[in-house]
Swiss-Prot record:
Molecular function terms from GO: identical protein binding; transmembrane signaling receptor activity
Disulphide bond pairs: C37-C73
Species this protein is from: Rattus norvegicus (Rat)
Name this polypeptide is given: T-cell surface glycoprotein CD3 delta chain
Membrane-spanning parts: 107-127
Compartments (UniProt record): Cell membrane
Stretches in topological domain Cytoplasmic: 128-173
Lineage, top ranks: Eukaryota, Metazoa, Chordata, Craniata, Vertebrata
Record bears the keyword Transferase: no
Modified residues annotated as Phosphotyrosine in this record: Y149, Y160
Primary role: Part of the TCR-CD3 complex present on T-lymphocyte cell surface that plays an essential role in adaptive immune response. When antigen presenting cells (APCs) activate T-cell receptor (TCR), TCR-mediated signals are transmitted across the cell membrane by the CD3 chains CD3D, CD3E, CD3G and CD3Z. All CD3 chains contain immunoreceptor tyrosine-based activation motifs (ITAMs) in their cytoplasmic domain. Upon TCR engagement, these motifs become phosphorylated by Src family protein tyrosine kinases LCK and FYN, resulting in the activation of downstream signaling pathways.
SUPFAM superfamilies given in the database record: Immunoglobulin
Record-level GO BP terms: adaptive immune response; cell surface receptor signaling pathway; positive thymic T cell selection
Tissues in which the UniProt entry reports expression: CD3D is mostly present on T-lymphocytes with its TCR-CD3 partners. Present also in fetal NK-cells.
Residues linked to a glycan: N38, N55, N74
Length: 173
């Protein structure tokens, strides 16, 4: 008999509905997030865009704007002390930027300004070198005589064999 009592209590525990007489639902419809409760809902903390249907439903806002908050569903008249809470935390993207026409125009204008400043800097730096003579003057200083190339001595076929071998050097002490 004792086993039947345990079996009946287990059967009743599984068959009878367990849980509270009210429920909180977080629903995403189109691009907005809703919090619904079959009794009255109370906003504890966070974002609320608009209340609907006599404090039973509220719109938190667009899902992409990361709505979040703490919401409590109150009990019925029979179970006034029972409450159920839910914490909503949406995190759609961490570093997202909404790309509208103003943002795109700002990026393009900033890119053009940066490119123009870079071109101006290169022009100012490379265009006006001070303290240097022109290339033609450097060539004239390097070539003292009229001859462009010196002939090799003794016409030896070995490459670089006698090139500058016994020439006098200017040694400074």
């Amino acid at each position: 008999m004792e086993h039947y009592g345990i079996l009946v209590s287990l059967l009743l525990a599984t068959v009878l509905p367990q849980g509270s007489p009210f429920k909180i639902e977080v629903v995403e419809y189109e691009d907005k997030v809703f919090v619904n409760c079959n009794t009255s809902i109370r906003h504890l903390d966070g974002s609320v865009e608009r209340w609907l249907t006599k404090n039973k439903s509220l719109i938190l806002g667009k899902g992409i704007l990361d709505p979040r908050g703490m919401y409590m569903c109150n009990g019925t008249e029979e179970l006034a002390k029972e409450v159920s809470t839910v914490q909503v935390y949406y995190r759609m993207c961490q570093n997202c930027v909404e790309l509208d026409s103003a943002t795109l125009a700002g990026v393009i204008i900033t890119d053009l300004i940066a490119t123009l400043l870079l071109a101006l800097g290169v022009y100012c730096f490379a265009g006006h070198e001070t303290g240097r003579l022109s290339g033609a003057v450097d060539t004239q200083v390097l070539l003292k005589n009229e001859q462009l190339y010196q002939p090799l001595r003794d016409r030896d076929d070995a490459q670089y064999s006698r090139l500058g071998g016994n020439w006098p050097r200017n040694k400074r002490s």
